[in-house]
Each structure stands twice: as structure tokens, then as C-alpha cells.
């Protein structure tokens, strides 16, 4: 036996099945009522006829009555045949409802409550008593309508077996009825009261008592407890009564099914293509709108939907169902995201985007890549937005996504960043890259240096009237250290993930040379032109020009007696430096230089891992 209704479904689906059953029973009821009304009209017309001869009229009237009774019996037999075939029809409807693939939300309910064909526990009569009846407020249950309207054998249809159609409707044994009276009934079918079971006469006895037509009509009981949410009584023409019980609910159900996911954030650039949605929108999709884990479900309209759609097609404006609502995208381009730079793990240059497009990501540093593998960055288009310097009020710029990669030895330095004392060589930096400039040239004008990330000490001194000494490529020797102004000094070059490691000449402790001087001026490492020209490194200038290195005072501890070495050591006004300071230029990537500048304490042991 096919165990069709033994799986749990949502209450909505059970209610839909109940309303379909009610509509079918209403159709049969209307046909039956029409036959009864025709019979009554013919009776009234015969009574209103002018009198014929006495015996002749009586004989003719008896013959007409026999004729009418035979016609009524034929109509009742045809109706019973239709009612016999009705369970099989509702079985087919249940199968098509299963093909609708409604979302089963009520998995916690009992497995038997999925359909309206259940035995009424109150009908405990003999084997030919109907399972439930249309009397009083009993409402309409699926099995009750058949037991009331059909022949004398009961038709209790259970959750575990197929409803008996016309071919296999056999009289049930008494123990089969008594054994299954406790099967739970549907949510959709209104429960009959105990008074419903008191009437134990079969439909044959009732037909013998009340003539060929039953009174009161079962349609009256359907109207008393209509399960529709609108609560309208199915009245009016037969067509109207057939379609009205369904137009409110089924149209709303189909609209909700077609419109599912319409309020969710769009994450694909296409319009209403209905492709598989990627869950990266502004807000997460609610779990009931997410597609089922069992795979794609075909969004099709079965014959049930087409059969009942004709009634409400004129009222409800048609909404286009998404054609490919559940098909996954055939290529990555179909399901691509709106913001492609949020795909993790792909560098910005490999996706063909400029470096500034990746600025919205904010991982502090990408780890694990060596400096040689980092591709050259291109920043030609962001020049118009880079006019402001960050306020020199102690704010260190937020970490940017365009930092170069660091090696594993650099990663080991991260843990000590927070334990460092206050900075000794503070920086004035900006949040954004700067436009490309020629490799060598005169000292930058204030407009040019406003667009640069780092400013040298010489450039900081320039507004105060101090003329910086030109750098001469001479062998190292002692040099006096004029006082540095109490401003935030710059101690590294931003754009240079440079690989040049020429050992520079000694430089005063608190100062850096102007960037426009001779080959080896520190400003050249800041130009994007030098970064773009050397493809071997991420943004490196060559070793020959000596630019881009990080100047580090290795005799800082020895200078503690001559110049103040506290946090204000670099800004100690007017204090001349003592013996010669040896400065070493370190080959460092941009990320490493940024990290070194965070470690600006007196301890140089940090640098042993470079």
C-alpha cells in the first residue's frame, strides 16, 4: 500500500488540501441541489396544471411521479458514482500538491496530520455508519462528506493508505474501523462534535426516509464552518461557489511563492534574473528565504495550479515567476558579486583594479608573501583626491590595505608592538597614496609635498626658515646635528618597498636630507614613478641611487650622553649631537618600515630579526 500521507507537512498545505476537498464537495453539492430544485419545480408545475379527468389525471400523475422518481434515482446514482470517484480525484490532487514542493515548516507536528481524510473518533457505530456526518456545526471533513453522501459502506481513509477510488471501495470489516478510530485528523478539517456520531443510520435508510434528495443539504454545513480565512459563505452561482473558496488563499499562496526572496538584498548586478543568490548583501537573508539544502527545486506550475488559476486570473495581476529561480549560475560571471574586491585572498593588482580600489579592505598587513613576489602597484587615477595631510596631532594613520607583504620574520615582530614606550621619532603621515613624480628633481614645493605621504626633516625645517644642508655623496664622517623643531618628524619613506641598501653617509640624528638633492636624496623613494618602473620589486627603486632606505641610528645609546634620548630626544631644541652617529640604511619593504616606525624605542634588538 502506498503510504502517501505519512510524512509531515506544513499546516498551510493541510489547509490547502482541506479547502480543495471542500470545493469539490461543494461542486457535487451544487449539482445535487440543482437536481432537487428541478424536481420541486416540476412537482409545483404539475400541481398548478388545470384539472383533467379524475381517474385519468390521477393515473397520469402517478405515471409522471414514477417518471420523475426514476429520473431522480438516475441522477442520484450518477451523483453517487461521482462521489465514489471523488477520493481518487482528491488522491490525484494530493499527489499534485506534493509536486508543488511547498516549504514544509511544520516538521514538528505529528506525521498523520497532513490530510483531511481521517476517521472521526466520535463515529463509533457499526460498520455501515458514516465516519462523520453533516449535521449541526460539524463542519466539513473529507471523509465525512463521502460517508454522508455516498452509499452505505463507510469510506474511512487513513494517513497510511491510499484513498479508495471507485474500483477498490470495498466494505470495511468492523475491526478495521474500530482499530483506526484514533488516527489524528487534519488541521484543515473542522472537527465534528460528539452529536455527529449519534446519527448512525446509513445513507440508504435516509434516502428511503427522505426521498431521493437529502435534507438538510451538506452544503449548508460547509457554509456554516467554512475554513477560508475570508469567512465568505460560498453562495451565488455554481461557478462562483466553486471558485470563491480558493481565490483568496490559493492566490495569496502562489503570490507568496512567486515573490519569495523579493525583499532580500540584491547581490548580483543583473536585474531580476533570479540566479542563485550569494549571501554577501548588506543584511543576511532570513533562514526561511534561503534555498533548501536538498538542491534546486524546479519552479513550475502543475496542472492543479493551472486548473484553479482560471478563477482568480482576472482579479489578481499576474506576476512573472523567476524563470531560473533555483538554477545555479553556469559560469562565475553570472553569479558574480557587486563588490568584487571583497573576495578574500586575491590581491588587488591581480584583479586588474588600481591600488586604491582595495583601500576599503582593512586587514592591517597581508602575511606570508615575500617582498619579491609582491606585484608592482599602479596608482595613476587617485591623484585628484590626495590633497590633505593628516593632522600632526599624534594620530597614527589607520592601517591600509595597500601595504606590501612581510616575511615570517617580520611577523614575529608584531607581538612587541604594544609594549613599546612612547615614540621617539614620530611621523606625520597621510591616509592615501600620492601621485607619481619624476625620479629626480628639485626640492619639492609645498604643493607637491602636500600630496606626499612622508615629509623629511629638512622639509619640516623649511617653513621655519632653516635652510637644510645639501647632501654631498662623500664618505661618512662626523657632522653637526642642528636642532630639530618640536614637530612630528618623519622617519621613513612610505611608497618605497625598496630593495636598495646602499650605506648612507652619517646624517644628523634629528634631521633627514631634502628629497630633491643628488642621487640618493631620500625623496626619490617616495615617487610612484620609481615604484612603477622597477617590476622586479613591489615598489622599489634601484640600488644605485641609494634611495628609499630606512635610516636607523645604530649608535643611539652612545648618543644618550650628548643628546636627550627620551621620547623628546629628537625634539630637544638646540642640543648639538656628540660624536659621529653612524646611520645604516636598511632594505625594508613598506610594511616593514611602518612596523619599524612603530618600534621607535631605544632598543635596537628588535631589528635583529630583519
From Swiss-Prot:
What InterPro entries does the record tag this protein with? Dapper
Q: Where is the composition biased (Acidic residues)?
A: 56-69
Q: Where is the composition biased (Low complexity)?
A: 120-138, 344-356, 524-545
**Which segments carry the region annotation Disordered?**
50-76, 102-179, 200-579
Instruction: Specify the signal sequence span.
Output: none
Q: Which GO terms describe its cellular component?
A: cytoplasm
Q: From the record, what ranges are coiled-coil?
A: 63-87
| Pro residues composition bias: residue spans | 317-331, 475-485
Q: Which UniProt keywords apply?
A: Coiled coil, Methylation, Phosphoprotein, Wnt signaling pathway
Sites where Phosphoserine occurs are at 6, 165, 237, 409, 456
User: Gly residues: which segments have biased composition?
Assistant: 566-576
Pfam families, alphabetically?
Dapper
Annotated GO biological process = canonical Wnt signaling pathway; epithelial to mesenchymal transition; negative regulation of canonical Wnt signaling pathway; negative regulation of cell growth; negative regulation of epithelial to mesenchymal transition; negative regulation of Wnt signaling pathway
Q: In which tissues is it expressed?
A: Expressed in brain and uterus.
**Where does motif PDZ-binding map?**
607-610
Using the record's annotations, give every residue carrying the modification Omega-N-methylarginine.
255
Molecular function in Gene Ontology: delta-catenin binding; identical protein binding; protein kinase A binding; protein kinase C binding
Q: What is known of its domains?
A: The C-terminal PDZ-binding motif may mediate interaction with the PDZ domains of DSH (Dishevelled) family proteins.
* Assembly description: Can form homodimers and heterodimers with DACT1 or DACT3. Interacts with CSNK1D, PKA catalytic subunit, PKC-type kinase, DVL1, DVL2, DVL3, VANGL1, VANGL2 and CTNND1.
**Family stated for the protein in its record:** Belongs to the dapper family.
**Cited function:** May be involved in regulation of intracellular signaling pathways during development. Specifically thought to play a role in canonical and/or non-canonical Wnt signaling pathways through interaction with DSH (Dishevelled) family proteins.
PANTHER family in the record:
DAPPER HOMOLOG 3, DAPPER-RELATED
Name by which UniProt lists this protein: Dapper homolog 3
Report the gene name. Answer: Dact3
